Every structure is written in C-alpha cells, then in structure tokens.
C-alpha cells in the first residue's frame, strides 16, 4: 500500500463523505438507491473536478478509516458511504435489528435546549445516529464543542415498535428519539 500522510487521508475521506453522502452531483456522479458509485467513474469525475484521487488512495482510505465510513461492493467495482446520507438519491435498505438496552448519542451542550424540546431528529440525514458505547458517543459530541452524552432507552423504544437498524460499521440508526426515551 502506498504511503500517504494523515492530512491527505483525512482530506480524501472528507471529500468522499461529501460526494458519497451528500452531494454526488457536485462532481457529476450518480449513486444507486443503495448508495453505490462506480469507482472508475468516481475517480474520473473527481480528477476532472481537480481532486487527486487514485484507486490506491481509495484503497488506503477504506482500509485505514477508524470509523469504517466506506465499503466496497463484493466485486470491488463500486464504493459507498456506509451511512450518514442526506442525498435523496440514496435509501439503503438496512435489515431491522433488536438494539441493546441502551444506546448513546454524543452532542454538544449548546444543542441540549432544542433536544429537550423535540428529542433527537435526523435533521438533514436519513436517520439519527447512535453509538453502542459512551466513548464513541463522546468522540462524536466533541466534534461539535463541549460533549454531552445522552443515554437512549433503546430496548424500551423497540418494545414500543420503533425500529432500529445497524450499519455495517456498527453505527445504530433510528428515525427519531422522543424526549421520553432520553436520559440526561
């Protein structure tokens, strides 16, 4: 595997997140309903848009991503963001899964007043993202400021018929979390 510096890997990961989750049209690619993009087309369109992207760089980003944000298709010809989409092109059909008793959501303290009013909502994304452990939730919350960890009564939600899904990178997904299922 070729050597790339951390900044190059981080910049490429951010670029891939942008085009594979949110704005594929920014470089002229189309994703299928499951979020897959043809790798050759992605590389070509990225290069036309002035972004240095190669298959080796893609392989390195996919292999070294601590959050496993991206995956390859079984034939190795396509790539997708595992979850976190806001583009209407994508509607990944995750298998419903029974959650553990509690899941966690990391946020910044400045968002608490709004969360106390309306619970957790997906916003521009398709799902609310939840973590199986507090440490991961804390890292997520720290990206937005002073982190606050909310405990989600996931099994109680599931018992009331609210579905959960789990992306292949371990992130738990649900449509919304009402205030009654949150512990501060």
Curated annotation (Swiss-Prot):
It holds the Pfam family PTS_2-RNA. The lineage of its organism: Bacteria, Pseudomonadati, Pseudomonadota, Gammaproteobacteria, Enterobacterales. InterPro entries: Ptrans_KptA/Tpt1 (IPR002745), RNA_2'-PTrans_C (IPR042081), RNA_2'-PTrans_KptA (IPR022928), RNA_2'-PTrans_N (IPR042080). Its EC number is 2.7.1.-. This is Probable RNA 2'-phosphotransferase. Keywords: NAD, Transferase. GO terms for biological process: tRNA splicing, via endonucleolytic cleavage and ligation. HAMAP family: KptA (MF_00299). Removes the 2'-phosphate from RNA via an intermediate in which the phosphate is ADP-ribosylated by NAD followed by a presumed transesterification to release the RNA and generate ADP-ribose 1''-2''-cyclic phosphate (APPR>P). May function as an ADP-ribosylase. Belongs to the KptA/TPT1 family. GO terms for molecular function: NAD+ poly-ADP-ribosyltransferase activity; tRNA 2'-phosphotransferase activity. It comes from the Bacteria. Signal peptide: none annotated.
